[in-house]
């Protein structure tokens, strides 16, 4: 016993250290209330155990209770535990007796859980070799499947031959379906009821819902013979009643012939979608499917026109419950629909069926091998509200969190799964949960019991003397007072005490609503936010204002609802620093002389000033030039007139000081050119309040006034000199031009050569004119004389 307690002690110390304060703050007054706070909490049932005040101090972490003086054997802390009831070893190799095959371990266990805690257990699964197989062939016999029916006439023999390579114990059966034999799913004229294909013309069987034709058998020839004798039928709409048939094939276990220790394969063959759920309301069928077997003496579905089609959820429940693995063999056009169904149905697979079912054999073999290469767990039973999680550890040893399926397994490989179970709340009932591999009959049964009570609750002293002469019952180290009594030991009477002594004012709540009045005194409640204190529980250390989510800006202490700031901080929220280090600009001036330092930050007061230290100010000018008017007024004024400069200095934000005792290290040296061209120098400093002080104003290097006569004389002489120079230049230019013209004339004259002759310009003083008319008349006279 001592070793167990010592081990328990070290276990307590290591558990949940990060929540050690949560148990004591929960306000638990009984052991059971303490356990409900969390799995890390424990209760001290030791008599006369006190620490500080209040019954709630008995509830804490085991380590804290030990530190408070509670003896280890009085600490109530029930632990979650797993007890394995049945754990047969997994089967290895081929087994002669299929009933002795074990494919999951363990097989049964009990699990005791503390609310809020979790427990992890390991489940192992191994598929045994040469496991028996039952295959039920469920075929759509609507008119469009006529060629498929001819193709599978020898399927039984071929399938048995191929399956014999995989298992030595194989059986197969046959069933068919069309549609609910009711309008609007079929035509209801007498001729078409008798022969739905009369309009083709072709003979068809009357429309039927589901027919179970051949129970599971190992006689392949019998299967072939049954298939050869089948005839097609017909209906109106494209979706068929296949889900009705699946439901009956899954739940009619005895008539189908499903064995308990075999792999149940249901091959669904169709070229159309299937009705489900409330589709049958079109025919006026409103009674939900009950999930029961309704095969009559002829092995036909007798409730086809009475019950609705099953829903997907109902199919999942019955397929899982009866360990049936569904293989959808459908045409290419329907694959996308049935793939969606297969994602919801555990263990279901989908294969593409050729138009004439020519590949059905290969499809079945491939689906079987795929199913045998996968191990997937499913959880059944009372699982609502449980916290369940899985981690798969497949054949390569790699863990896959949040996964309960292993793929690409070989028959004989072992798949392990870590299953974590937790319950969030205390429950007065036990739960029964089943964990099983999909498609296998083996299962792990788990009985989950909540651990919500303490062992000390079994021992109760009614009207105990430990409770003030029998005024209460003593249990788990505390008194449960009888009516009319109160107090830790039931020492106070409710009738004899006034609650007024626990009120700060008559209109206030007792103990400010944050404590209990015991025997005229307030016992303040524990709070997860901090301490509640005061004679009336009126104070606390967590109700002060917050800055950026931090109590008192994390720079002060909360005392009775008000922030008391630490050194270096001020303000209602203690968020305002008194330091001015961040306000000093690079030149050492507080806020560059353009603002005030408030809460450690510069508030720029000069228009246009900005920046962390108001260093940017396009409209401000430099700090020296901004003081020009004040400085020039001070230098030009004498005596009483200097008082007139005070206003100008105020506008410039400065004060002139004659004191020489100041710190020159942080002073700014300024130089300005005055109106009289004198160089003005002065120093600028800043006092503790951020005000600008001007020191050491001096004026030097003033230029002498100009000599006006000398300037005028110089200007006159310069003008005269310029005139003389211009005249000389003009004279030189004229002389140069004349000389050039004379030289040109002399050159032309030297080139001239004169000859004697008549002057072409001379004319004589006389002129001779000849009368042309006179000569013509003389000629006429001569002619007349000759004629005569």
Swiss-Prot record:
Name the membrane topology term: Single-pass type I membrane protein
Region described as Interaction with HAX1? 731-758
User: InterPro entries from the xrefs?
Assistant: I-EGF_1, Integrin_beta_N, Integrin_bsu, Integrin_bsu_cyt_dom, Integrin_bsu_tail, Integrin_bsu_tail_dom_sf, Integrin_bsu_VWA, Integrin_dom_sf
Q: Where does Ca(2+) 2 bind?
A: 179, 235, 237, 239-240
Query: Which processes are annotated in GO (biological process)?
Result: cell adhesion mediated by integrin; cell migration; cell-cell adhesion; cell-matrix adhesion; integrin-mediated signaling pathway
Q: Where is the signal peptide?
A: 1-21
Asked if the record carries the keyword Cell membrane, the reply is yes
Taken from the UniProt record, the cysteine pairs bridged by disulfide bonds within this chain are 23-41, 31-454, 34-59, 44-70, 197-204, 252-293, 394-406, 426-452, 456-476, 467-479, 481-490, 492-519, 502-517, 511-522, 524-537, 539-560, 544-558, 552-563, 565-574, 576-599, 583-597, 591-602, 604-614, 617-620, 624-670, 630-649, 633-645, 678-702
Q: What residues does the I-EGF domain cover?
A: 456-491, 492-538, 539-575, 576-615
The record's subunit annotation is: Heterodimer of an alpha and a beta subunit. Interacts with FLNB. Interacts with HAX1. ITGAV:ITGB6 interacts with FBN1. ITGAV:ITGB6 interacts with TGFB1.
Function of the protein: Integrin alpha-V:beta-6 (ITGAV:ITGB6) is a receptor for fibronectin and cytotactin. It recognizes the sequence R-G-D in its ligands. ITGAV:ITGB6 acts as a receptor for fibrillin-1 (FBN1) and mediates R-G-D-dependent cell adhesion to FBN1. Integrin alpha-V:beta-6 (ITGAV:ITGB6) mediates R-G-D-dependent release of transforming growth factor beta-1 (TGF-beta-1) from regulatory Latency-associated peptide (LAP), thereby playing a key role in TGF-beta-1 activation.
Q: What note about domains is in the entry? A: The VWFA domain (or beta I domain) contains three cation-binding sites: the ligand-associated metal ion-binding site (LIMBS or SyMBS), the metal ion-dependent adhesion site (MIDAS), and the adjacent MIDAS site (ADMIDAS). This domain is also part of the ligand-binding site.
The protein's name in its UniProt record: Integrin beta-6
Which gene name belongs to this protein? Answer: ITGB6
């Amino acid at each position: 016993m001592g070793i167990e307690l010592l081990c328990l002690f070290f276990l307590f110390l290591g558990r949940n250290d990060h929540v050690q304060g949560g148990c004591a703050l929960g306000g638990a007054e009984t052991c059971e209330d303490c356990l409900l706070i969390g799995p890390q909490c424990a209760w001290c049932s030791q008599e006369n155990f006190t620490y500080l005040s209040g019954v709630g101090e008995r509830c804490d972490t085991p380590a804290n209770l030990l530190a408070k003086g509670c003896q280890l054997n009085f600490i109530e802390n029930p632990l979650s535990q797993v007890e394995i009831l049945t754990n047969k070893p997994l089967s290895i190799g081929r087994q002669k007796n299929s009933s002795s095959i074990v494919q999951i371990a363990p097989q049964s266990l009990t699990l005791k859980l503390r609310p809020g805690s979790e427990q992890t257990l390991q489940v192992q699964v191994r598929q045994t070799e040469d496991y028996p197989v039952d295959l039920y062939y469920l075929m759509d016999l609507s008119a469009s499947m006529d060629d498929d029916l001819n193709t599978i006439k020898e399927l039984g023999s071929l399938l048995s031959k191929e399956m014999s390579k995989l298992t030595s114990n194989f059986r197969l059966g046959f069933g068919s379906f069309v549609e609910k034999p009711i309008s609007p799913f079929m035509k209801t004229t007498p001729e078409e009821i008798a022969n739905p294909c009369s309009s083709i013309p072709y003979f068809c069987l009357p429309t039927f819902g589901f027919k179970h034709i051949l129970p599971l058998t190992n006689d392949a020839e019998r299967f072939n013979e049954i298939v050869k004798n089948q005839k097609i039928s017909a209906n109106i709409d494209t979706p068929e009643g296949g889900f009705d048939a699946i439901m009956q094939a899954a739940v009619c276990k005895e008539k189908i012939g499903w064995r308990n220790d075999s792999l149940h394969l249901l091959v669904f063959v169709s070229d159309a979608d299937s009705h489900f759920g409330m589709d049958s309301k079109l025919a006026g069928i409103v009674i939900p499917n009950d999930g029961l077997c309704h095969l009559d003496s002829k092995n036909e579905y007798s409730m086809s026109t009475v019950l609705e089609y099953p829903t997907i959820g109902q199919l999942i429940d019955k397929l899982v419950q009866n360990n049936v693995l569904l293989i959808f063999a459908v045409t290419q056009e329907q694959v996308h629909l049935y793939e969606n169904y297969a994602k919801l149905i555990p263990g279901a697979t989908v294969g593409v069926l050729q138009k004439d079912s020519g590949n059905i054999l290969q499809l079945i073999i491939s689906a079987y091998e795929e199913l045998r290469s996968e191990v997937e767990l499913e959880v059944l039973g009372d699982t609502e509200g449980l916290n369940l999680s899985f981690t798969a550890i497949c054949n390569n040893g790699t863990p896959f969190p949040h996964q309960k399926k292993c793929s690409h397994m070989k028959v004989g490989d072992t798949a392990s799964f870590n299953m974590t179970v937790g319950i969030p709340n205390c429950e007065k009932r036990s739960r029964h949960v089943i964990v099983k591999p999909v498609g296998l009959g083996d299962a792990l049964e788990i009985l989950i019991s909540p651990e919500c009570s303490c062992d000390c609750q079994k021992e109760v002293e009614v009207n105990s003397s430990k409770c003030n002469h029998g005024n209460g019952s003593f249990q788990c180290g505390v008194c449960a007072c009888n009516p009319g009594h109160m107090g830790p030991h039931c020492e106070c009477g409710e009738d004899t005490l006034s609650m007024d002594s626990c009120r700060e004012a008559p209109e206030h709540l007792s103990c400010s609503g944050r404590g209990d009045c015991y025997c005229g005194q307030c016992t303040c409640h524990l709070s997860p936010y901090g301490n509640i204190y005061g004679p009336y529980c009126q104070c606390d250390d967590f109700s002060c204002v917050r800055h950026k989510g931090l109590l008192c800006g994390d720079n002060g202490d909360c005392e009775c609802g008000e922030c008391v700031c630490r050194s270096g901080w001020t303000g209602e929220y203690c968020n305002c620093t008194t330091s001015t280090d961040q306000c000093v600009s690079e030149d050492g001036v507080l806020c560059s002389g353009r603002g005030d330092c408030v809460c450690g930050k510069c508030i720029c007061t000069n228009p246009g000033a900005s920046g962390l230290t108001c260093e940017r100010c396009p409209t401000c000018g430099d700090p020296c030039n901004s003081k020009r008017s004040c400085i020039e007024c001070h230098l030009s004024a004498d005596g009483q007139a200097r008082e007139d400069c005070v206003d100008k200095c105020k506008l410039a934000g400065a004060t002139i000081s004659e004191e020489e005792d100041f710190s020159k290290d942080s002073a700014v040296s300024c130089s300005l050119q005055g109106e009289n061209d004198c160089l003005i120098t002065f120093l600028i400093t800043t006092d503790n309040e951020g005000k600008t002080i001007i020191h050491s104003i001096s004026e030097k290097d003033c230029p002498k006034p100009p000599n006006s006569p000398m300037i005028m004389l110089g200007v006159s002489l310069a003008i005269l000199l310029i005139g003389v120079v211009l005249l000389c230049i003009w004279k030189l230019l004229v002389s140069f031009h004349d000389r050039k013209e004379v030289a040109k004339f002399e050159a032309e004259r030297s080139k001239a050569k004169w000859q004697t002759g008549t002057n072409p310009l001379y004319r004589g003083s006389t002129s001779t004119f000849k009368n042309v008319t006179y000569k013509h008349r003389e000629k006429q006279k001569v002619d007349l004389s000759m004629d005569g």
